[in-house]
UniProtKB/Swiss-Prot annotation:
Cofactors, names only: heme b
Binding site for heme b b566: 97, 196
Binding site for a ubiquinone: 201
UniProt protein name: Cytochrome b
Transmembrane segments annotated in the record for this chain: 33-53, 77-98, 113-133, 178-198, 226-246, 288-308, 320-340, 347-367
Length: 379
């Protein structure tokens, strides 16, 4: 009798994706983040579902419903903080996953890479709308500031903003629709993840050397399943340490004050994972220019396959490109720090220089260094 695992229409798909999948024998721990992102998504959907059972998306009761979850619901505090800090873990894994793709040249898989960038946008949109839901001061003002950026779009801007708000300011209609979108988007993300994997399995995984590994494959199970389980345990350990010891470490104290349209917080800033983009937005004095730079700071990832000038795929054997890559990482840390600082000297100029450096490295320096390395190797 043939194995049901290999014949059953549904189980067969799972088998080809997670069990009998031929995988390169040398993929490192940097390849763990795909599975970790899957676990993060599952954690977020499950905790979010239980939060939605007790949350009310009305301006009068939203804040107190979150308080009710934390105080009166069995383990409600745990679910709420797992969801809030789960988002932070999600973004840590996302940034490392994208960074791995950039370092090892995984972006040469066009479809997989582009769907990954779309996924990044979708996750950022979901996180932004989720941050609005507790209806604290930073929720309200964050929503006001970020949605207002759309008014920079010529001709249709103002109409578009009022259409998104459902009125003339961020109010009940805005909160209700943000809750609806925040609920549906993770399921759209799950569908996109499946397409992401579909395209990945068309080509097979990349590996640290960037060389074709068809002659040296091993089965995904048991080798990489056990490796993924180790990663998952470490992820859960990190998440639960954060949740149980310092759940508010990454949050903003202003969000423990109920939303008040008449009182603006002294420093409006998003969650830490948006600060690098926020710093780029603020570094341009022009509103439309800032919005364009903000969008391009993520959209530029789609240009990497076009800007790849090296004859080698990975940066593993390219020390000059490696050096530039780590300068780019340091620059992103600088932008993240600047995004959380007030708009005053010297932070303004540091932010502007870091923003210029970010785009210059990606568009000019990395391709130029790649061409230089080709010359050094007489290619």
């Amino acid at each position: 009798m043939t194995n049901i695992r290999k014949t059953h229409p549904l189980i067969k798909i799972i088998n080809h994706s997670f069990i009998d999948l031929p995988a390169p024998s040398n993929i490192s721990a940097w390849w763990n983040f795909g599975s970790l992102l899957g676990i993060c998504l599952i954690i977020q959907i499950l905790t979010g579902l239980f939060l939605a059972m007790h949350y009310t998306s009305d301006t009068m009761t939203a804040f107190s419903s979150v308080t009710h979850i934390c105080r009166d619901v069995n383990y409600g505090w745990l679910i709420r903080y797992m969801h809030a800090n789960g988002a932070s873990m999600f973004f840590i894994c996302l940034f490392l996953h994208v960074g791995r793709g950039l370092y090892y040249g995984s972006y040469t898989y066009f479809e997989t890479w582009n769907i990954g960038v779309i996924l990044l946008f979708a996750v950022m949109a979901t996180a932004f709308m989720g941050y609005v839901l507790p209806w604290g001061q930073m929720s309200f003002w964050g929503a006001t500031v970020i949605t207002n950026l759309l008014s920079a779009i010529p001709y249709i801007g103002t109409t578009l903003v009022e259409w998104i708000w459902g009125g003339f300011s961020v109010d009940k209609a805005t909160l209700t629709r943000f809750f609806a979108f925040h609920f549906i988007l993770p399921f759209i993300i799950t569908a996109l993840v499946m397409v992401h994997l579909l395209f990945l399995h068309e080509t097979g995984s990349n590996n640290p050397s960037g060389l074709i590994s068809n002659s040296d494959k091993i089965p995904f199970h048991p080798y990489y399943t056990i490796k993924d389980i180790l990663g998952i345990l470490l992820l859960i350990l990190a998440l639960m340490t954060l949740v149980l010891f310092s759940p508010d470490l990454l949050g903003d104290p202003d969000n423990y004050t109920p939303a008040n349209p008449l009182n603006t917080p002294p420093h409006i800033k998003p969650e830490w994972y948006f600060l690098f983009a926020y710093a780029i937005l603020r570094s341009i004095p022009n509103k439309l220019g800032g919005v364009l730079a903000l969008v391009l700071s993520i959209l530029i990832l789609m240009l990497f396959p076009i800007l790849h000038m090296s004859k080698q795929r990975s940066m593993m054997f390219r020390p000059l490109s490696q050096c530039m890559f780590w300068i780019l990482v340091a620059d992103l840390f600088t932008l993240t720090w600047i995004g959380g600082q007030p708009v005053e000297y010297p932070f303004i100029i540091i932010g502007q220089l870091a923003s210029i450096l970010y785009f210059t490295i990606i568009i000019l320096i990395l391709p130029a260094i790649s061409l230089f390395e080709n010359k050094l190797l007489k290619w």
